[in-house]
Amino acid sequence: MSDQLQMTDGMHIIVEALKQNNIDTIYGVVGIPVTDMARHAQAEGIRYIGFRHEQSAGYAAAASGFLTQKPGICLTVSAPGFLNGLTALANATVNGFPMIMISGSSDRAIVDLQQGDYEELDQMNAAKPYAKAAFRVNQPQDLGIALARAIRVSVSGRPGGVYLDLPANVLAATMEKDEALTTIVKVENPSPALLPCPKSVTSAISLLAKAERPLIILGKGAAYSQADEQLREFIESTQIPFLPMSMAKGILEDTHPLSAAAARSFALANADVVMLVGARLNWLLAHGKKGWAADTQFIQLDIEPQEIDSNRPIAVPVVGDIASSMQGMLAELKQNTFTTPLVWRDILNIHKQQNAQKMHEKLSTDTQPLNYFNALSAVRDVLRENQDIYLVNEGANTLDNARNIIDMYKPRRRLDCGTWGVMGIGMGYAIGASVTSGSPVVAIEGDSAFGFSGMEIETICRYNLPVTIVIFNNGGIYRGDGVALSGAGAPSPTDLLHHARYDKLMDAFRGVGYNVTTTDELRHALTTGIQSRKPTIINVVIDPAAGTESGHITKLNPKQVAGN
């Protein structure tokens, strides 16, 4: 009996390794061969959050990674469960969120000979194109070092998703307990500072000082860096206007006088020097081409050197982590002080005021049914009084309009579809943000977007999370007034069920539901949902004719030679 007590197995080893590396939460869906691993993690004090679908579990893990700078852990079963989680792993990698997906897998000896094992799949090689790295463990004594490598890879350099493959026979393999403990590695300084070249920093300050119309663009890499105070000090010292990308909103409050968000198009078209801080010149910024001046000069602060010159020539690359780079910029600024020309700030303010007036007219229009603008105006009123909440946002028109209308006041409080524009992140991100922060979360969802992960409301209710889900329901993908070209009475490809009552879903799970048709009802329901800290769905009835095809990115749809 005493000899048996001194033995351990792979699943106990991996849990102990997680514990020693201060991993306190696992998001997942259990089944063969990982159920007992989740049970043991709970027994060891690691919080396990069980989901209804692996994709949402992965999104929750990724959101946790973005908010904490520690890898979020997603646990899945083999093959189908692994594939369900793979979208979330790829999304984490594309967006630069640290995440580790741990999946059970089948016996390698059978899989490699394709002999038809239970849920047979070569998962490691399937994961490689979509992850920053993928590792498979073939013997229990390597579990500790494998997890250590996964942690370091996920958070060092540009963060991303890492896949860790744990075959069932490795989870069940035994080792002498004392020996097993010696194989566990506690990762030290997993994400060391990467200092920029001093000459690059000097050149960046010199170019900004000469600029007549400088602009700073803050990306979600800047938000992830948590260099909030350095960024604020630099912007306020130089008086350079800034433009936040959607998940960078709140690094400086959206109401800050130097925010150029309300004059975005004018600022991009007229800036002569643009400093990108943790932002990429990808499709979200028209690759730095359409809508930009041809002679704009770019400074780019990024941790990934391969990102430099990806679409436009970068006059001054500053390669390093954002916090170290901004520290260097501030130090150099003390030696070479400058202030942005007032005329540039004044002309931006004129355009901001003009656009704000146009938006005010849209927001103040009273319609029945509601449209996106007056409904979001009501949401904005409530969230202005609840600035600590975390906001999750997905959809087409719901996303695009909410991004422009709802102000953020604190960093890393907004989570949305990100670089990929992926739908289905809503409930996973909301759960991840709630579990990580303990704060109330408001998820503003298009009705189509909500459908991708809607069953996770059971997860929200099971854990009694303070999540309020606001569903903008216009009965369709983009809009709900599509016409079926077949003429046979079938729904159009973009139609959903009209007059759906999403609020009644909460009856099944003992949550709270509201159906609202006016702005006053919406304000009351949202305020009550936040203050009660109870799982809540608010079904907001929106005009089916409100919205546009694909929201603000209609132009990305291919043009037909012959229209239908």
Spans of model-derived segments:
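Phosphate/pyrophosphate-binding active-site segments
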Residues: S2-L5, Q141, D295-G395, T519-T528, ...
